[in-house]
Curated annotation (Swiss-Prot):
Enzyme Commission numbers on file: 4.2.1.17, 5.1.2.3, 5.3.3.8, 1.1.1.35
Gene Ontology annotations for the cellular component aspect, listed alphabetically: fatty acid beta-oxidation multienzyme complex
Protein name: Fatty acid oxidation complex subunit alpha
Binding site for substrate: D297, N501, Y660
Catalytic residues in the record: H451
Binding locations of NAD(+): M325, D344, V401, V402, E403, K408, S430, N454
Length: 715
């Protein structure tokens, strides 16, 4: 053994060839943490010191090669002073460069996935052999940063600027054939042939058949582009990528600027340019929010996994109520491998559900994400029915009938009589109390909420709601089924609106106040979209439906009369009373026309302004910042209350619920992380400026205490 560490070993194989093997002890995957980097430095030094070494192959002892840097270390690292962070980055980069500069040929064998720092390690080798099932990529932009271990330097010198920009700016994972096509790897072989192919390559390089020094040299030199070629490549790509990423996600464009700045430098100077830009991005609130979001998502997955032991296996599911929602649930279950019965009392409901599932499956086939055979398989897994005949075999039933307590009570009581005693029944209610709905059941312990968000196939969140009598088995089984469907479940306790709708309606309340104070709803939409929301409040209400919004607001007003009851006539009342229900009937705040693709396109309708005139109580001169605060303060404060009331257990779950459920701007990290970014004391002071707008704007006593003590939601 030439070197043995806790993450890396180096052993002699044959004829002067050594194997540098990544196998991080106590972990299921390899990652670049401090320990691994330290091991790599010592391993490279050991290889350099051994005169008998003629070639190196790099392998992984795990099912994946290296998943990237250890993101849990980012939070503390990114707090370091700039100079210290740059120095640490350059120190790490020297390890990769020392490996690249070894006086012998190096070949890396890529199995599973090699992402971020994992793929940057691969690029430091002379040759790359990749398994047919492996994937490679540089996903750092998804964390608000760009590659920091030489990725912006080596990749453009390996595969050309255009290809490198596409890989880095998109952050996508690339399959073996695509990597080979652009020369990011040198060979692709079957997984079982990987070691053999790597050994063959290194032997050919040792014998002189392959000139490894000539292969290595372009990575050490400046980019082979003249000034005109550089201008054409970089200026065009910057404009295109800026349009794609938008102003709130600077990392993709900064990556291109870094490649451009370093284009005329050799490797070492180019890496210094990369390090300076990397640190600049690491210090942005966007990077801090996106790194936090990643860690919160990991926490969410961990919490969901903790329920696995208590969960019963769901082999057959059922959905009550077909239509668009039922069809979406059936599609999601079937396409992820769980057969499902889809029951409705009307044939047209069944047909609508089947049409929805067929449409969604057809789109996947069109995009090449599903074969026609798999589509047929998924469709066959959806069994339409108008009776309860087969419900005796069902493990879980999702009730998705109309949002009416009486109807739901009747349907729930009825289905309970047709399922096994241990079957779980879940309601897809968006606002009605689970404990109240459970009153219709003989076995309330087997009942919980399972709230999907529209459109089901696109929205990652499922709220799993615990009622007063819900058992842990019911929660665990529902969480496991949601995960099986490819969703991100968040367990919440029962209250009107649960987590997401309870938080969303105060946001709409803020919007109603803005309109009452003379704000043009089109302006409000533009301001909130610029803030980062996928759509503004007026457009969102049109998409949700004025009838749904009106009903939801009444439920919330009944549940929280002290702050959500509004005796004044609001914009939603006006639209609802005028039968302007939104997209569903072609008129709401906006009017809707069909575009060439048959999708509703919003247009400004003067009649909407006429209808709203009588409810403008006073015209206030409100800035864009005021408009943002009118809506964001109530949303954030209600999220705080949900955490304080124990509706949701952690800040991470609250924030991820909003990001996955209503499209809260990811780069802002969620409502509680947004408060942290402003500062708790500063946020409280800001809310106090709007105190005259009512109780929705009044911070809780506990939040004031946090402000006084300098506390945060995230350490």
């Amino acid at each position: 053994m030439i070197y043995e560490g806790k993450a890396i070993t180096v052993k002699a194989l044959e004829s002067g060839i050594v194997e540098l093997n990544f196998d991080l002890k106590g972990e299921s995957v390899n990652k670049f943490n401090r320990l691994t980097l330290n091991d790599l430095r010592q391993a490279v030094d050991a290889i350099k010191a051994d005169a008998s070494v003629k070639g190196v192959i790099v392998t992984s002892g795990k099912d994946v090669f290296i998943v990237g840097a250890d993101i849990t270390e980012f939070v503390d690292n990114f707090k370091l002073p700039d100079e210290e962070l740059v120095a640490g980055n350059l120190e790490a980069n020297k390890i990769f460069s020392d490996f690249e500069d070894l006086g012998v040929p190096t070949v890396v064998a890529i199995n599973g996935i090699a992402l971020g720092g994992g793929f940057e390690m691969c690029m430091a080798a002379d040759y790359r052999v990749m398994s047919t099932t492996a994937k490679v990529g540089l996903p750092e932009v998804k964390l608000g940063i760009y590659p920091g271990f030489g990725g912006t330097v080596r990749l453009p010198r390996l595969i050309g600027v255009d290809n490198a920009v596409e890989w880095i700016a998109s952050g996508k994972e690339n399959r073996a054939e695509d990597a080979l096509k652009v020369h990011a790897v040198d060979a692709v072989v079957a997984p079982e042939k990987l070691q053999e192919a790597a050994l063959d390559l290194v032997k050919r390089a040792i014998s002189g058949e392959l000139d490894y020094k000539a292969k290595r040299q372009p990575k050490l030199d400046k980019l082979k582009l003249n000034a005109i070629e550089q201008m054409m490549a970089f200026e065009t790509s910057k404009a295109f990528v800026a349009g794609q990423a938008g102003p709130n996600y600077p990392a993709p464009v900064e990556a291109i600027k870094t490649i451009q700045k370093a284009a005329n430098f050799g490797r070492d100077k180019a890496i210094e340019v990369e390090a300076a830009g990397f640190v600049k991005l690491a210090k942005t609130s966007v990077a801090q929010s996106l790194v936090g979001l990643f860690l919160s998502d990991q926490e969410l997955k961990k919490k969901a996994k903790a329920y696995d032991k208590q969960a019963r296996d769901v082999k057959l599911a059922a959905v009550l109520g077909a239509g668009i929602m039922g069809g979406g649930i059936a599609y999601q279950s079937a396409v992820k491998g769980t057969p499902i019965l889809m029951k409705d009392i009307r044939e047209e409901g069944i047909q609508m559900g089947l049409d929805e599932a067929s449409k969604l499956l057809g789109k996947r086939v069109e995009k090449g994400r599903l074969t026609p055979e798999k589509m047929a398989q998924a469709l066959n897994a959806i069994r339409p029915t108008m009776s309860y005949g087969d419900f005796g075999n069902v493990d879980i039933v999702v009730e998705a009938v109309v949002e009416n307590p009486k109807v739901k009570h009747a349907v729930l009581a009825e289905v309970e009589g047709h399922v096994r005693e241990d079957a779980i029944i879940a309601s897809n209610t968006s606002t009605i109390s689970i404990s109240y709905l459970a009153q219709a059941l003989k076995r309330p312990e087997n009942f919980c909420g399972m709230h999907f968000f529209n459109p089901v196939h696109m929205m990652p969140l499922v709220e799993v709601i615990r009622g007063e009598k819900t058992s842990e088995t019911a929660i665990a089984t529902t969480v496991a089924y949601a995960k099986k469907m490819g969703k991100s479940p968040v367990v919440v306790n029962d209250c009107p609106g649960f987590l997401v709708n309870r938080v969303l309606f105060p946001y709409f309340g803020g919007f109603a106040r803005a309109i009452a104070h003379g704000v043009d709803f089109v302006r409000a939409d533009k301001v909130m979209e610029k803030f980062g929301w996928p759509m503004g409040p007026a457009y969102l209400m049109d998409v949700v439906g004025m009838d749904t919004g009106h009903h939801g607001r009444d439920v919330m007003a009944e549940g929280f009369p002290d702050r959500m009851k509004d005796d004044t006539r609001t914009a939603v009342d006006v639209m609802y009373d005028a039968n302007r229900l939104g997209q569903k009937n072609g008129k709401g705040f906006y009017a809707y026309e069909m575009d060439k693709k048959g999708k509703p396109k919003k247009v400004v309708d003067p009649q909407a302004y006429e209808l709203l005139k009588p409810i403008v109580a006073e015209t206030r001169e409100l800035s864009d910042e005021d408009i943002i605060n009118y809506m964001m303060i109530p949303l954030c404060l209600e999220t705080v209350r949900c955490l304080e009331d124990g509706i949701v257990e952690t800040a991470a779950e609250a924030d991820m619920g909003l990001i996955y459920g209503i499209g809260f701007p990811p780069f802002r990290g969620g409502a509680l992380r947004y408060i942290d970014s402003i500062g708790v004391a500063e946020f409280v002071a800001m809310a106090d400026k709007y105190a005259d707008l009512g109780p929705l704007y009044h911070p809780t006593a506990k939040l004031r205490e946090m402000a006084a003590n300098g506390q945060r939601f995230y350490g």
